[in-house]
């Protein structure tokens, strides 16, 4: 039976870098909220134990693709604990709408959707905590997508506290460049000592992103996109970029601005949601 699963985008409504660990990873404080917009995974369970990605990504070997890695990781973990039914396999394809290197969490979201969906379809019975622990092996952002609730994140992004930020409308714009996360995190000018603050303090401050100035300085397309958006509404970088977003109180206000976007700027309008579309699909 063919099944379709949402793989939603996320926004970092704020992002502050509070330090750098001895292993090179940065510690941070960030606020994750999901969008009712993203990729869609189509999964058809198999009974012969085969795992096939029907929509490979050019230049990325299947075994390095996060979708395949997530499926194999679940297979291994469930098998190790005798919770993988014999013959469990799947054909997986993706309808990709989220840009790579956009700061919307596309790859992490894909991995989380695979973990959650295959755990359900195969009947493995792993708990949400177990799936989140597996997800952390694939990327720091994967656990928040597994848990599916808007969250305040600390540590390297894996210490999550559920929160309920206002569900606004967003115009998300992609300036046509891809920004690999390491480019931003390795920049010597990146702030690395923003003081840690409580959730309540941060939620009542003006939101900002410590990566934004670096992204604007190094990528003129990001600078141009933000300069344009800021004429209309409060706007920020999400994650390490390249996408930027502006917040609105209504869908119509966001669409009105999108309709005036310059030809070089791609964008979409979406609602911020505190319960992810993936989580809603399981209810």
From Swiss-Prot:
Pathway: Isoprenoid biosynthesis; isopentenyl diphosphate biosynthesis via DXP pathway; isopentenyl diphosphate from 1-deoxy-D-xylulose 5-phosphate: step 3/6
InterPro entries per the UniProt record, alphabetical: GHMP_kinase_C_dom (IPR013750), GHMP_kinase_C_sf (IPR036554), GHMP_kinase_N_dom (IPR006204), IspE (IPR004424), Ribosomal_Su5_D2-typ_SF (IPR020568), Ribsml_uS5_D2-typ_fold_subgr (IPR014721)
Entry annotation: catalytic residues: 10, 141
Catalytic activity: 4-CDP-2-C-methyl-D-erythritol + ATP = 4-CDP-2-C-methyl-D-erythritol 2-phosphate + ADP + H(+)
Alphabetic keyword roster: ATP-binding, Isoprene biosynthesis, Kinase, Nucleotide-binding, Transferase
Uppermost EC category: transferase
Chain positions recorded as ATP binding sites: 99-109
Family annotation (SUPFAM superfamilies): GHMP Kinase, C-terminal domain (SSF55060), Ribosomal protein S5 domain 2-like (SSF54211)
Biological processes, Gene Ontology terms: isopentenyl diphosphate biosynthetic process, methylerythritol 4-phosphate pathway; terpenoid biosynthetic process
EC annotation from Swiss-Prot or TrEMBL: 2.7.1.148
GO MF terms, alphabetically ordered: 4-(cytidine 5'-diphospho)-2-C-methyl-D-erythritol kinase activity; ATP binding
Role this protein plays: Catalyzes the phosphorylation of the position 2 hydroxy group of 4-diphosphocytidyl-2C-methyl-D-erythritol.
Family stated for the protein in its record: Belongs to the GHMP kinase family. IspE subfamily.
Assembly mode: Homodimer.
Name of protein: 4-diphosphocytidyl-2-C-methyl-D-erythritol kinase
Originating species: Klebsiella pneumoniae subsp. pneumoniae (strain ATCC 700721 / MGH 78578)
Lineage of the species this protein comes from: Bacteria, Pseudomonadati, Pseudomonadota, Gammaproteobacteria, Enterobacterales
